[in-house]
């Protein structure tokens, strides 16, 4: 990461959407912001190789407030219980109240961060507020996870966190975010943003698998096929994100991994974690940063700028030639008919979360619990 991008004369802007067509997406892929995002992912990935979640430590004076902020988000959720919505297996309306509460608290939460310029909060907090799910659709997908990554990247660009904080950013801060998201997903039954189980990895997340495979890259004994061994999952899931995610998936879905998560099953046949990690990075570039249905929701400001037509002649030329190649739906989402891949199904048919599908609408009696929340039971598929 380069030197902090902040000075007394810095003009911060509220991030907005810029990717409206394939031409805009191509411009983003050529941009410095695209490089900054991927390089940040790679730097964090390299800094956690061989490191365990249980060895994350307490963080520094710079990063401990980030944990405090995430804990406060969890507390907001705990104080905003789901409404009685037994007739629906889709997202719980109480999530919208939670979303608004986080927005109301955001300014004060960001004031806890030492070294964060107050004038930068208006820009940085937008990524934070958009990290928890979509208020309108009551769903969650890789775009929101990307917003959280962008929030961390902005803090790094501002010099709020430094290179020595990078291991804790993943093993401490990011993992706490995942824990909070699991609570939100199970409490409010957030729908997966895309009806393919998103990437075929997890209904909601991608980065825990990317960085999780990075953690295991030089492990002497554990191999990708170890995800099929319940004893290994039981012993090591507390240490490694990848294994924890597998154990979590198994806890809410029955049948074999091959049935409910075929891509994870296929990946388990790869010989080394090194190859898994390389594949995950390529997949992220192609299926997240490279797909219009995902990146149309990306936000750009002064810290993560979008190139202008004047800065990118190819963009200017393409915009002049492009004519109605992408269609906007009732939600304001753009769909390109030529788009292929897992991420094409940005909206699709609403899909209930695994938690909602597992909920017995009539009675909780005799039903196993998950995370101390009654009525959640394993299901064969979502």
UniProtKB/Swiss-Prot annotation:
It is an enzyme of class 5 (isomerase). Its EC number is 5.2.1.8. One of its GO terms (cellular component) is cytoplasm. Keywords: Cytoplasm, Isomerase, Rotamase. Residues 363-382 are annotated as: Disordered. It holds the Pfam family PTPA. It is found in: Cytoplasm. GO terms for biological process: mitotic spindle organization; response to osmotic stress. It catalyses: [protein]-peptidylproline (omega=180) = [protein]-peptidylproline (omega=0). Its main location: cytoplasm. GO terms for molecular function: peptidyl-prolyl cis-trans isomerase activity; protein tyrosine phosphatase activator activity. Belongs to the PTPA-type PPIase family. PPIases accelerate the folding of proteins. It catalyzes the cis-trans isomerization of proline imidic peptide bonds in oligopeptides. Acts as a regulatory subunit for PP2A-like phosphatases modulating their activity or substrate specificity, probably by inducing a conformational change in the catalytic subunit, a direct target of the PPIase. Can reactivate inactive phosphatase PP2A-phosphatase methylesterase complexes (PP2Ai) in presence of ATP and Mg(2+) by dissociating the inactive form from the complex. This is Serine/threonine-protein phosphatase 2A activator 2.
